[in-house]
Amino acid sequence: MKKKILVGAAILVVLAAVILTGVLVVSKYLVGGEKRTRDKWEIETGTYTFTDDEINVQMYRQPVEASIQVAQILPGEYEQEGFTYYDEEVQQRLAQSLMTMMDRGGFTMEEPLAVLNPFGTGSNGLYLYFTTDYNCQIRYTVTTDDETIPAYTATANSAQEYGKVQEFLLIGLVAGQENQVTLEAVNKQGEVKDSFTFTIQMPATTSGHANRLEATEGESTAEMSEGLFYAMGLSDYYGYTFFFDNDGILRYEMLLDGYHSDRILSLGDQILACVGSNKIARISRIGQVLQVYDLGRFELHHDFNWGPDGELVALATNTESETVEDQLIAIDMDTGEVTLLVDFSALMNDYFVTTEKVSANSSFFWQAGLWDWLHLNSVQYLEEEDAVVVSSRESSTIIKVKNVHEEPAIDWMIGDEAFWEGTGYEQYSLTKEGDFTPQYGQHDVTVIYDDSLPEGQYYLRMFDNNYWANSTRTGYTPSLPDSVGQALTEDASIVSHVYYYLVDENAGTFRLAWSFDVPYSSVVSNAQLLEGGNYVVNSGVPQVYGEYDSAGNLIRQFQYHSMMNGYRVMKDDFVGYWFR
């Protein structure tokens, strides 16, 4: 009998080891997928017509069923290994092909030049070009036969606010549906001078993502803000950014080289976005990639932002280093030159050398073997001080570093002061004022200046995950209140927060100025303040995002689906880019 028990126990041990190994393998695969480059561009073609050999661009017609003529242009090498649309030379050839078609002339609202996704950076965008006999704007409305999908109306951003040349990317077509599109030419007096309706059958999404999300109404009766939510870093949809309207309908599927966008920065009628693990691109309003910034040995990690004039700053990993996710780099937007601004393992070396690599039985087991001792996840540049404020998930600390272009030095740190006691860095900790629990595992920290505050005071807004875990300093055990989560997955008794700190650099203090509760998410997530006062909050582990009113009450929440989590969801009206 004893022998049978021992054999049974041995079998259980083996099974546990197999399960653990399987979990580690799957987790490693998903995490690795974040950095992988797209190995193919799945494109359904129409009827082949000819190849422009001079620029090696293939021409097709009717790649989709439509009541108007729709063209398709593809680089001749699009099926070759290593091909990418995020190549300036490829984009210039496509632009030349498009210009050749435009030069034929004679395009009208009723017979426009229509090209499906001409630059390959989206799956359901329709490029339209035509001229009118009078100055106007083009307003369009998209409907489907599915009565549960509301109509979508927008004013297209053409070359001029009111002009006779109409050229734009039509955003809003629903994947997997026959779409009815009504174009209206509207003059300065608001009169509709002409209109035209056509139909177009759009294919299913390239990613396989559903064309709608489940929406749940909150208690607030406040109005939703205008714009599109854009979801980035859904764990089994790396290489895509999804744009949803206020009803949860997918209105645009952006195709990347890999990775995720992190955020979208507006630059007039262009945007900047991360498009690969080591690429940032500048993209025009019609989807053309105008410039690609190759980061060389650096891999992006979860945030980039504006630097001083003509510069971007980004969080990164130096792939030639033994550590990960602890570098701050700058990118010159004119030359593309990449400069290391801060190596945090050098800046904080006395603490860094006391840390260790992540183990397979730690909270962040999917990073086993990596030296992720700081795990930076958001950055904001403060130009007047040549400083940055960064968020460190691993230490649950917000860090301000000054003189980043000259001699970087720590200015202050905000978090649980006990964490830094005895490390030699306690001198930088600002003092917590008031009875509240400081942030743990925070993301998306933003500095907010307020003219009503005296000099030296400002607010910090953040998504406080309210989750404690540290996998690289195993000798430290914090004293935590029961309100702080330690479960990686959902815990019904724990909530996360949107926190506002009032920072007083003069007094060396911080206090909680305001907060509101949001669904618990141990990792990832973000909180964005919109111009009208509403908030967009993404809780990435339960995979929900919502819009909240100015008092922190939920207006509407959306459920998405991902194998692990969704990194960030933001919202923009994209006026000046896609829309007027």
What does each model-found stretch correspond to?
Residues 61, 65-142, 163-167, 171-178, ...:
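Histidine-/acidic-rich catalytic cores in large beta-rich domains
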Residues 147-161:
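Solvent-exposed serine/threonine-rich low-complexity stretches and specific carbohydrate-binding patches
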